[in-house]
Amino acid sequence: MLRRLTDRKEWKFFAVLPKADPPLAAAWWTVLLLRGVLPAAFAIAMGVLVGAVQGGHSLAAPLAFAGAVFVLLQVLSPIHQAISSNLGDRTAAWLYDRLTEACVRPPGIGHLEDPTLTSDLTVARDFDLGMTGPPLSISMDFIANGMVEMIGGVASAAILVRYAWWAPLLLAGAWLATHWLLRESAIWRDRNTEEVRGAQRDADYAYRLAVDPPASKELRLFGFGGWTVDRFTVRRTRLHELQYAATRLRERPVVWSVLLVVSANVVVFWLLARAAGEGRIGLGEAVVYVQSAVGVSMIAFGGFSWALDGAAAPVAAVLRLEPAMRPAGALRSGSRRADPAPAREIRLRDVTFAYPSTSLGTGDAGAAVLAHFDLTIPAGSSLAIVGQNGAGKTTIAKLLCRLYDPQSGAIEIDGVDVRDFDLASWRSRVAAVFQDFMRLELPLRDNVAPAGAPDEIVRGALVSAGAANLAALDTVLARAYDGGTDLSGGQWQRVALARALAAVALGAGVVLLDEPTAQLDVRGEAEIFDRLLAETRHCTTILISHRFSTVRHADRICVLEHGRVVELGTHDELMALGGRYRTMFDLQAQRFNVPEEEAGTTYDVLS
């Protein structure tokens, strides 16, 4: 029983508050309890005052008592609101700290791409942005007010016991029944069902198409304006229909709630009135009991339920993610220090790897992306990897960077399993540019060398990447900052390339480029790739690209299909072979109807 209670997300939410800020949490609970009992105390104070007036006694003490309680009722509310707001902010910060640590601390990235963790990660990440409910700084006040009313209702019921033991039970039972009767319909009304959320997403999508700048060009060019308006109207109408249907769901529960509450209150107030009329209770007692009977209504169903549910869900999500992310992103780290560069070769030996499967629903591995994969890359050479989407090209890049480890087989550097190297040592020897590279809202210097580097290295990397005149090193790459600037997609790609070249200058001996020039123009691509090969001529370079005008310059080209090497050789060898590489190369060439012998100067535009 106790275990079931402590496993509830509401319990976990309240348990987190003192961890986030112990003094503030203590103050929040103290003021909450005071506010909860003050309505009952005020009822007693008014009864004492009325009794004193009726009996002709001194009014000084009763008035002072009633005045003090009244002042506290007025003063404690704004104080509690301020405490709630601060505690909500501290709790949100505590949760974000825990979430950030849980996401960043594991050395791999499996926990960030595991579909079984996606739902919790989304809830935990977005909870305080106002997307799924009010931020904690606001919802804490709703929760506080709801709990004050609950405590006030219980305190009022306790006073009413003195009149008749059954009276508080009757009233409390009627008001508590509203929680059971209205909860499910309230969840529907608050758009917490999948159907309502789906309709909201559909309507929001059409709305964003209409008002957001990125879609404005195509919207007008292809004449989608009318379609967008019609789509928004239909989806929004559907959403309103669902909301209306949800409101109709409340009709029967509301009727039953009204009948129960009215019946219980009629019985209690009628008997109180008769007792007062017959003189069985005094006027002062009648005032106390009437106010207490009214106070019991504070335990009725209200905003407390949905506010607590919305605040408790992300807490439970973060607490679930912490232990789940650690093993999902775990990687073994050895003790050997990696050499600056491979001396003989990089070998992927009998490597099998699969990502966690959504279909299995357990985080177990799904279909293998690479199966018994073998590939040897001579040290100091350049290898281009090509293939259709899903062939496993980017997966190889992730494995070489040790963002994942294979389920079987090994990646060996000069015969040494890469898992035997110290993880940080190995990664310092790898310079990588991924398709979704970082765009840091930091100065240009820190974008090129996030871990720090002499300005000479930073400037040299920018020159080699064709970004020498991009901006001053201290310029923040975001317009939101004073003196900041924004960059185009191609300019950002040059910064990412400069980051890799700076890593090479700092000692990296393996260069991994995943679509490194996808956002550059034709002339810029040819220029940058020639520079890259020149700057990394002493390194082992792995290039992943769909542009055959780029990959043809590599020492060797590897064609992947369904996680296996189907062709391997130089550009000339693969063209002479007449296999898949030749087919893909000719397919790009035919789009421009250019003779093959001119391909080296014209295919740069293809992607």
Name each model feature, range by range.
Residues 121, 368, 467-495, 499-516, ...:
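ABC-fold ATPase nucleotide-binding domain signature/coupling loops
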Residues 1-39, 61, 80, 117-119, ...:
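Membrane-integrated ABC transporters
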Residues 224, 268, 295-326:
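Cytosolic ends of transmembrane helices, especially the final helix of ABC transmembrane type-1 domains
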